[in-house]
């Protein structure tokens, strides 16, 4: 695979290899055959980052070969959304001959939505001034005149210039209901929107007969907690990143959801609060004991759950675990399987043509 060529004819084979690998990894904990969710074979990534290469008068996007570290010119990127591909051409055309925009530019980051909105961030090794702002505003207006719904952001050391805003609003059809998600530049969002829809619908399906409340750790912009709110009396969710918490609060209001409470704190801190080890001012006015959480949802970073959080989640009758790293999932399952059994297993092909796997498990108490 190269940045400009996807081996789409190999999609089925690479997916079958992942299914076999996941089943083998999960064998000590479950004999289940994974439920498999396929990705679109191209144009599935909603975000992408590229370095810029200045080659005389020419300017183009590049990526680096992971093995050789050699640079690869990238004029089209079929893994990315059609909108990113359109913007890649338009941005190069708009920047190449403009000194204020091109000088010391070293990277462009693209974030797009299925609703055809985009944020493009331009990263510089220089101070950004009024000349840059005027040139960027003219470029933005020219792009919009071409029918592109785009926002531009300039970044340099300790500097961030938003011409309008640093977010876009995604609209996803999830189990018969449109969900609105504000996505903030430079914050985590699910990269494969089509796969995200399938993950949300799978999570809804496996929790459809839930009782009581839901606790979610690492909720981000509320991606899962807001979709799952319809299956629970109440949802209590934690997140540490300020921009993600602000986006989650917006998303709660935009989706007219009244049974979700977001707390800004780390999972480790929340564990301490639940266990009565520490008190936190951020929890004033929130009656943790009043929640009847029968289900806990975790979508941890690649490192998985720490040992204290492992112990904490074992106290819940049902654990819904979405993992972007099956190796750390299996490490966590060595502990969790002492008290819970795997009742559902899913493979989400979030990153086609790579070795990366995303998977989901539902664990029920023995």
From Swiss-Prot:
PROSITE patterns attached to this UniProt entry: SAM_MT_RNA_M5U, TRMA_1, TRMA_2
Keyword Repressor part of the UniProt annotation: no
Entry superkingdom: Bacteria
Signal peptide (from-to): none
Catalyzed reactions per annotation: uridine(54) in tRNA + S-adenosyl-L-methionine = 5-methyluridine(54) in tRNA + S-adenosyl-L-homocysteine + H(+); uridine(341) in tmRNA + S-adenosyl-L-methionine = 5-methyluridine(341) in tmRNA + S-adenosyl-L-homocysteine + H(+)
Residues that coordinate or bind S-adenosyl-L-methionine: 190, 218, 223, 239, 299
Annotated keywords: Methyltransferase, S-adenosyl-L-methionine, Transferase, tRNA processing
MF (Gene Ontology): rRNA binding; tRNA (uracil(54)-C5)-methyltransferase activity, S-adenosyl methionine-dependent; tRNA binding
Gene Ontology BP annotations: tRNA methylation
EC assignment: 2.1.1.-, 2.1.1.35
InterPro entries (alphabetical): MeTrfase_TrmA_AS (IPR030390), MeTrfase_TrmA_CS (IPR030391), SAM-dependent_MTases_sf (IPR029063), TrmA_MeTrfase (IPR011869), U5_MeTrfase_fam (IPR010280)
Active-site residue list: 324 (nucleophile), 358 (proton acceptor)
One GO term describing the cellular component: cytosol
Top-level EC class as recorded in UniProt: transferase
HAMAP family the record matches: RNA_methyltr_TrmA
NCBIfam families registered for this protein in UniProt: trmA_only
Summary of the function given for this chain in its UniProt record: Dual-specificity methyltransferase that catalyzes the formation of 5-methyluridine at position 54 (m5U54) in all tRNAs, and that of position 341 (m5U341) in tmRNA (transfer-mRNA).
Family label: Belongs to the class I-like SAM-binding methyltransferase superfamily. RNA M5U methyltransferase family. TrmA subfamily.
Stated name of the protein: tRNA/tmRNA (uracil-C(5))-methyltransferase
Organism encoding this protein: Salmonella heidelberg (strain SL476)
């Amino acid at each position: 695979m190269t940045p400009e060529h996807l081996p789409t004819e190999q999609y089925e084979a690479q997916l079958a290899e992942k299914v076999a690998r996941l089943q083998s990894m999960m064998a000590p904990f479950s004999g289940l055959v994974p439920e498999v969710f396929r990705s679109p074979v191209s144009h599935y990534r909603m975000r992408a980052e590229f370095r810029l290469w200045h080659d005389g008068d020419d300017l183009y996007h590049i990526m680096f070969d992971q093995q050789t570290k050699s640079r690869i010119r990238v004029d089209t990127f079929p893994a990315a959304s059609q909108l990113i591909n359109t913007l890649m051409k338009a941005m190069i055309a708009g920047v190449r001959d403009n000194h204020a925009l091109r000088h010391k530019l070293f990277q462009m980051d693209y974030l797009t939505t299925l609703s055809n909105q985009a944020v493009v961030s331009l990263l510089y090794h220089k101070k950004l001034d009024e000349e840059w702002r005027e040139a960027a505003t003219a470029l933005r207006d020219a792009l919009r005149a071409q029918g592109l719904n785009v926002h531009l952001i300039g970044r340099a050391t300790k500097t961030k210039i938003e011409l309008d805003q640093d977010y876009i609003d995604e609209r996803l059809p999830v189990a018969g209901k449109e969900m609105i998600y504000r996505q903030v530049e430079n914050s985590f969002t699910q990269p494969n929107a089509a796969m995200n829809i399938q993950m949300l619908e799978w999570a809804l399906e496996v929790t459809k007969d839930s009782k009581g409340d839901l606790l979610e750790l690492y909720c981000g912009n509320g991606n899962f907690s807001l979709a799952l709110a319809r299956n629970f009396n109440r949802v209590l969710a934690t997140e540490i990143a300020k921009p993600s918490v602000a986006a989650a609060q917006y998303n709660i209001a935009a989706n007219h959801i009244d049974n979700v409470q977001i707390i800004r704190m780390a999972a480790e801190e929340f564990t301490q609060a639940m266990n009565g080890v520490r008190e936190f001012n951020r929890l004033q006015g929130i009656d943790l004991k009043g929640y009847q959480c029968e289900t806990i949802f975790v979508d941890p970073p690649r490192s998985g759950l720490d040992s204290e959080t492992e112990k904490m989640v074992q106290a819940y009758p049902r654990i819904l675990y979405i993992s972007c790293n099956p190796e750390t999932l299996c490490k966590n399952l060595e502990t969790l399987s002492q008290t819970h059994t795997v009742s559902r297993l899913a493979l989400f092909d979030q990153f086609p043509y790579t070795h990366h796997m995303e998977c989901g498990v539902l664990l029920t108490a023995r």
